[in-house]
């Protein structure tokens, strides 16, 4: 047993937990920690981001891509508050993260000291748990608990706030082996009776649908899900967060459900007699009007978090547990079903309602389809938020889990660039591509400097239409084309901006330029920037208006038909 100071104890605890990378930004309250990290550069890589929000998003992207806990570090006051959006983003999407912040000395707490903020109080609603450490003897135990809480059950962010004196004070430290975080409760939280009821519901169904949420990704249940689909002979849809839990190239895959889901997925949920929901929380962006959601169906909901059961949608049977663990047992009770008539109906809808875009011009969907073709679907895609995010969900096919990193719950513009850096550092042998709109890029474009500084070989694609595209689309459809504050500056040369950081940069203005530029970007050894100039009137289709039912899903063709009838 050795006597170490708090900074040494923190670093030793991080090593215990297998931490190999930290994303952060130094400052006065964490100087002792940074001094100790300096001594361990060969064991723990520190990535200096351009802004603390970028550090939080990078830790998030690292966690989503690798499945490990992401770690970010910031100083007190504004350093800590700059993490808040990233922490909230991780909380909404159930991402395991430990955010470590420094604070003023214990004797200065509560005195409005320089750069003092009650960051524990600020983040209480957006963390699974948070701690303030004012005694060095409690530091090691707290760090270990933080990592366990972040990764256990339904994952999420944990904040550890450490006063500056704790980082200098000494106490005895004893190394401990890492205790693996429990994915579910130690004792099985579901019963044989529940499994029997679920098996009976599945056996009786004539028109079943399987709906996958983010929990299906977190639980690593893709093999069990494939087995369930085979046994049930059922079509599959997913939420934005569930993409990759089931092979997007499988003919039984209908696409995404919800506000910008496919007509096939939305209509099938309305028509089905059984909806099997795996690790989803029934977001309003998925369900539309909850009173009419899956109105003809019995609903079986499997989720690890009991708080999500019957919260937004009332279900007929719920099973509390990790999706993978539950399906392992449930699949044993099922016999192979056949639903030929139902599957033929699904195939007919897929043929009738394909996803479409304007094929005669350069569009976001076209570029993303080409990106999919040239990467053979093997890239990790991160996105910002808006039209390009929906196009990425619709037109890139995800056949593996943890290949789409996107802000689903909070809808954070500026998330994707930092997340792509974190993912690329976590998985250096994968190709990571961030898709952004010009509005989102302007939120955190400073992280391009981070990619340049560390030569992180991400590809940053910016779809430039000089407007806030998704907001403008709503103004077009629902606000009488009154375009209030959605026009962006048209005199910014983003290519020159990237080149000023010694980043290889391209501008694409025509369809016939796309293939060559993507190929060059994929061959590059460092970061690449691609600006794709698209029309401001390009929209995302299909669409369900806010508060409407999934039955009211409409396409561009439906809008034009309605306008034509109105003119007669």
What are these regions (language model features)?
Residues 7-11, 15, 19-20, 33-38, ...:
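Active-site diphosphate/adenylate-binding microenvironment
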Residues 299, 371, 383, 422, ...:
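Hydrophobic, well-ordered secondary-structure elements that form the walls
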Residues 1-334, 374-377, 457-460, 477-480, ...:
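N-terminal alpha/beta PP-like core and its mobile active-site loop of ThDP/TPP-dependent enzymes
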Residues 137, 200, 296-387, 511, ...:
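Phosphate/pyrophosphate-binding active-site segments
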Residues 25-27, 46-57, 72-79, 134-135, ...:
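Active-site nucleophile and cofactor-binding loops and adjacent substrate-binding regions
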């Amino acid at each position: 047993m050795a006597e170490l100071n708090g900074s040494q104890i923190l670093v030793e605890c991080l090593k215990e937990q297998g931490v190999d990378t930290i994303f952060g930004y130094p400052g006065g309250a964490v100087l002792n920690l940074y001094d100790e990290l300096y001594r361990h550069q060969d064991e723990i890589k520190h990535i200096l981001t351009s802004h603390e929000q970028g550090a939080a998003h990078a830790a998030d992207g690292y966690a989503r891509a690798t499945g490990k806990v992401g770690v970010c570090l910031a100083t007190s006051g504004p350093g800590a508050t700059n993490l808040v959006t990233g922490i909230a983003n991780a909380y909404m999407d159930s991402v395991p993260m430990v955010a470590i912040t420094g604070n003023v000395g214990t004797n200065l707490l509560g005195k409005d000291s320089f750069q003092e903020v009650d960051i524990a109080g600020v983040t209480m609603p957006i963390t699974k748990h948070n701690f303030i450490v004012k005694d060095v003897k409690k530091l090691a135990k707290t760090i270990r608990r933080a990592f366990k809480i972040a990764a256990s059950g339904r994952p999420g962010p944990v904040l550890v706030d450490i006063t500056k004196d704790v980082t200098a004070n000494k106490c005895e430290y004893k190394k401990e082996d890492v205790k693996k975080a429990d994915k579910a409760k130690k004792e099985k939280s579901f019963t044989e009776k529940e499994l029997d009821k679920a098996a009976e519901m599945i056996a009786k169904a004539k028109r079943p649908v399987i709906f996958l949420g983010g929990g299906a990704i977190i639980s690593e249940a893709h093999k069990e899900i494939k087995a369930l689909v085979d046994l049930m002979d059922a079509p599959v849809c997913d939420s934005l967060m569930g993409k990759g839990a089931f092979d997007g190239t499988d003919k039984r895959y209908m696409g995404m459900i919800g506000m910008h889901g496919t007509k096939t997925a939305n209509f099938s949920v309305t028509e089905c007699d059984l909806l099997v929901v795996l690790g989803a929380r029934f977001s309003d962006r998925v369900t539309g009007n909850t009173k009419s959601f899956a109105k003809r169906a019995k609903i079986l909901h499997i989720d690890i978090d009991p708080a999500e059961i019957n919260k937004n949608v009332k279900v007929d049977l719920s099973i509390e547990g990790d999706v993978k663990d539950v399906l392992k047992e449930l699949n044993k009770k099922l016999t192979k079903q056949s639903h030929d008539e139902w599957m033929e109906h699904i195939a007919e809808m897929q043929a009738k309602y394909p996803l479409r875009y304007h094929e005669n011009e350069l569009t976001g969907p076209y570029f993303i389809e080409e990106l999919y073709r040239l990467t053979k679907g093997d890239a990790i895609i991160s996105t910002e938020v808006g039209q390009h995010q929906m196009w990425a969900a619709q037109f890139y096919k995800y056949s593996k889990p943890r290949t789409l990193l996107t802000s689903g719950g909070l809808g954070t513009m500026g998330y994707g660039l930092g997340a792509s850096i974190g993912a690329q550092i976590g998985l250096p042998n994968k190709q990571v591509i961030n898709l952004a709109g010009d509005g989102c890029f302007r939120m955190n474009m400073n992280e391009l400097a981070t990619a340049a500084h560390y030569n992180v070989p991400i590809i940053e694609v910016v779809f430039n239409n000089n407007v806030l595209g998704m907001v403008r689309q709503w103004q077009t459809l629902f606000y009488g084309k009154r375009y209030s504050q959605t026009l962006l500056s048209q005199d910014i040369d983003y290519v020159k901006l990237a080149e000023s950081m010694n980043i290889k940069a391209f501008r694409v203005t025509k369809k016939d330029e796309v293939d060559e530029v993507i190929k060059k970007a994929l061959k590059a050894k460092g970061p690449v920037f691609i600006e794709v100039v698209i029309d401001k009137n390009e929209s995302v289709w299909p669409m369900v208006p806010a508060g409407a039912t999934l039955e009211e899903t409409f396409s561009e063709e439906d809008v034009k038909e309605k306008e034509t009838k109105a003119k007669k």
